[in-house]
Design a protein with these regions (language model features):
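N-terminal secretory targeting modules
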Residues: 1-93, 121-122, 152, 255, ...
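Short histidine/acidic/glycine/proline-rich micro-motifs that form metal-
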Residues: 99-102, 106, 133-137, 164-166, ...
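Residue-level signal for threonine
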Residues: 18, 138, 250
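Serine-esterase "nucleophile elbow" of acetyl-processing enzymes
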Residues: 68-135, 145-153
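Secondary-structure junction/capping motif
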Residues: 24, 35, 110-117, 138, ...
């Protein structure tokens, strides 16, 4: 079980999430190896190694009585179909760790796969969402493999890193520097970046949590990237939307993440990118 799983597991089983301001924003985590940098419709093999040598994030069993039962969140409806399908080729790179991999769910049920399916059903017929994550990865590992991930030539990147840094107590300045480096390199490649956030709990110590909570909104403001404040909003802590490990979402949990958390931020970005690409080809 990874440090991420160990540290988060305890707090996910508490009866409520303790917020302090927006305590502990960290970036989302994604998971298939970049060797799996293929559109989500392709088969991928999992790996648990990265350049920073993280431990694998494996589910651990907890009893249902230990899991948090929350009121069922209101699920946004699917996207409305476009009047005219958009055939402009669009590549979206989802990069992070195990939550993007979809640990514990079928390949077609992870968030990149569901996101691609929803976009195509709505009329974005030539969109591909690439699942490029690494379980247990730190922000240093992500930066070290970024050139590999960029071979997919993404138009849009959903960037989610930093959770495993927090679990290891990596200095906040290191995490900040790595995320900024990743954003700079992604933007330099021509990719529009969406920064995904995650909340951590006070078991890491108030001082660290408070410092960590300032990283992501500050970076989003400084760089002007689109921003998802809490990637698992409405899902974290809900026993009905998480697997027995109380960490990784179920298929239904990922549906909520896609419809309620990703699409409201992604769609304005996608519309702008499509318009820009269409005008450049005319």
């Amino acid at each position: 079980m990874s440090l991420l799983s160990t540290a988060i597991k305890t707090k996910y089983t508490h009866s409520r999430i303790k917020h302090k301001g927006r305590m502990g924003i960290v970036t989302l985590f994604t998971a298939l190896v970049c060797m799996a940098c293929q559109p989500v419709s392709d088969n991928k093999s999992d790996t648990e190694n990265d350049n920073s040598q993280p431990t694998a994030s494996q589910p651990t069993q907890t009893s249902n009585s230990q899991r948090v039962n929350s009121p069922a969140p209101v699920l946004n409806p699917p996207l409305q179909p476009l009047a005219q399908p958009i055939t402009t080729p669009i590549t979206i790179l989802a990069i992070g760790d195990s939550l993007t991999e979809g640990l514990g769910v079928a390949e077609q049920d992870n968030y990149p796969a569901q996101l691609q399916a929803q976009l195509r059903e709505a009329g974005y017929s030539n969109v591909s969402v690439v699942n490029s994550g690494l379980s247990g990865e730190t922000s240093t590992g992500l930066v070290n493999r970024l050139d590999w991930a960029l071979k997919t030539q993404p138009d849009i990147t959903i960037l989610t890193t930093g959770a495993n840094d927090a679990m290891r107590g990596v200095p906040v300045t290191t995490v900040d520097d790595n995320i900024r480096t990743a954003i700079e390199r992604l933007q330099a490649s021509g990719s529009t970046v969406i920064l995904g956030g995650m909340e951590i709990y006070d078991n890491m110590g108030d001082d660290y949590v408070n410092q960590f909570s300032r990283i992501y909104p500050r970076i989003a403001k400084d760089t002007g990237v689109a921003y998802i404040p809490f990637f698992l909003n409405g899902v974290a802590g809900d026993a009905n939307l998480n697997q027995k490990d109380a960490i990784h979402p179920t298929k239904e949990g990922y549906t909520h993440v896609v419809r309620n958390n990703i699409l409201p931020v992604l769609m304005p970005v996608l519309t702008e990118v499509v318009q820009e690409k269409s005008s450049n080809t005319q």
